[in-house]
Structure formats: C-alpha cells, structure tokens
C-alpha cells in the first residue's frame, strides 16, 4: 500500500510565458518533482524533473495501449520487460521539451547521466512522435527511440484507433543491448478498452515478450475497470504474468484496488 501528498501550483508571467511546479512527498528515498516553463506563442514547453517523474521523450509513446486503470504488466514483478525504457533510464535531473506542429506532437528527453548515473558512460537521449488523426479520424500513430548511451537502443512503433466508446491499440517494441550476452527483447502489446458510460470504463490486454537468451516468452495478461462518482474514482485490475523473465513455470498474479479523491 502506498500513500503520498502532492503540492502543485503555477501562474502566468507578464511576457506570456507560464510556470508550473509539482512536488510529491512520499515514503521514497527521493521525492518526485517537476518544473515546467511554457515558452508561449507556440514555442513549446521546457521541463526539468526528477526521481520517478520523467521530463519527456520516449515515455510519451512507450505504452499507448488503452487501459481503464493500469497496464497488464504492472505490479506482477519488479521489472517491466518489453518497453522502450526497459534498458533503464535516469530520470533524476532530466530535461525535456515538448511542442505540437499541427497534428504532430514532438517530445524530447535528455539526461547528462545514463541509467548507471555515470557521466563516463555517456548521456541519455530520447524522442517520442505522435501523429493524431493520422490518415483518418480516430487513428493515432506513434514512434519512439531511446538511446541509453553504450547500454542499449530501444525502439517502439504503435497505432491506436478510437470509434465511439471503443479504443484499440497495437504496439511493437525492440530492445537491443550493446553487449551480445544481454537479453535483447522483442515485444508485442495489444489491448482494447470500452467506455460503458461516462462513469464506467473496462479494458483487457495482452503483452508477449521474446527474450533472446531464453526459450520461453514472457506473457502478461490483464483486465481492469474504473468507476468515477463525483470526486471519487475507484480503479481495479487483475493481472497475470507467465514465464517471468522468460523462465518457464515462474508465474505471478496480482489484484489491485485504488481509491482516489479529488479536492
């Protein structure tokens, strides 16, 4: 069970720019923080963030699969395989930039230290591209790349289509480590969500991850739902993983329940 308190605020500057600050207090060793500067006049937003809060880049597109509450790989084990950030990223003292050009959203991320927190190993950089209403109404296409210096290259591509209350998504991700002995990964992630009404949403999904050094694919499946009543939101999920890390016979199941209040 986790608990936290978040303080946030912001305002407009006389020159047309905007400032927003968020700070979360919790039981972690470091508190999450985010500072955003809106440049005004369509010039985008610069973000500086830390701990588990990312400033931008591939995180904007690493998982576009629709879900009512949480992703199918959440809470079942310590490592989220098959994502474009699986090789590890450093979100402490991270910079980001985001802007929109017509129907194209661009998100950039940069950190002078990679996930080993060593400048000697080089910097991290990433990009996330989102094309809204691509080719037809309701269709979204995404592409992203995360370069973890000399650790790995992560690439992802996906599409999402919405028609009425129904949304479906499909995404491919490739994690290519620099060392030949590491566990390169290829993942296929798909899911569908449905808004039953303005208060209730349900979803189901599946993710399979092929790991080069193992004979069995890791498979994550799950169902979730969320219900909103006034200022109260209830979320629930049942997730299951088979062959954790590609190890046959290693399984885990988890049931999650979340209650949130908006003041």
Feature map (PLM): residue ranges:
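Outer-membrane beta-barrel proteins
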Residues: 1-263
């Amino acid at each position: 069970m986790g608990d936290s308190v978040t303080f946030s605020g912001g305002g407009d500057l006389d020159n047309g720019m905007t400032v927003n600050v968020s700070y979360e207090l919790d039981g972690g060793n470091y508190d999450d923080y985010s500072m955003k500067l809106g440049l005004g006049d369509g010039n985008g937003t610069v973000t500086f963030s830390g701990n588990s809060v990312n400033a931008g880049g591939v995180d904007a597109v690493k998982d576009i699969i629709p879900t009512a509450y949480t992703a199918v790989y959440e809470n079942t084990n310590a490592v989220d395989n098959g994502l474009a950030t699986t090789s590890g990223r450093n979100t402490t003292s991270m910079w980001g930039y985001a802007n929109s050009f017509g129907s194209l959203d661009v998100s950039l991320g940069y950190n002078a230290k990679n996930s080993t927190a060593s400048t000697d190993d080089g910097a991290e950089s990433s990009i996330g591209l989102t094309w809204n209403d691509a080719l037809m109404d309701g269709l979204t296409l995404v592409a992203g790349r995360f370069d973890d210096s000399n650790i790995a290259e992560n690439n992802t591509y996906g599409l999402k289509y919405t028609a009425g209350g129904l949304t479906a998504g499909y995404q491919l991700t490739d994690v290519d480590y620099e060392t030949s002995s590491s566990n390169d990964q290829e993942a296929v992630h798909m899911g569908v969500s449905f808004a039953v009404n303005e208060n209730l949403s349900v979803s189901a999904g599946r993710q399979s991850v092929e790991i080069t050094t193992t004979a069995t694919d890791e498979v994550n499946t799950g169902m979730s739902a969320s219900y909103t009543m006034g200022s109260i939101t209830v979320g629930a999920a049942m997730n299951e993983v088979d062959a954790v890390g590609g190890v046959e016979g290693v399984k885990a199941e988890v049931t999650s329940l979340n209650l949130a209040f908006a003041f």
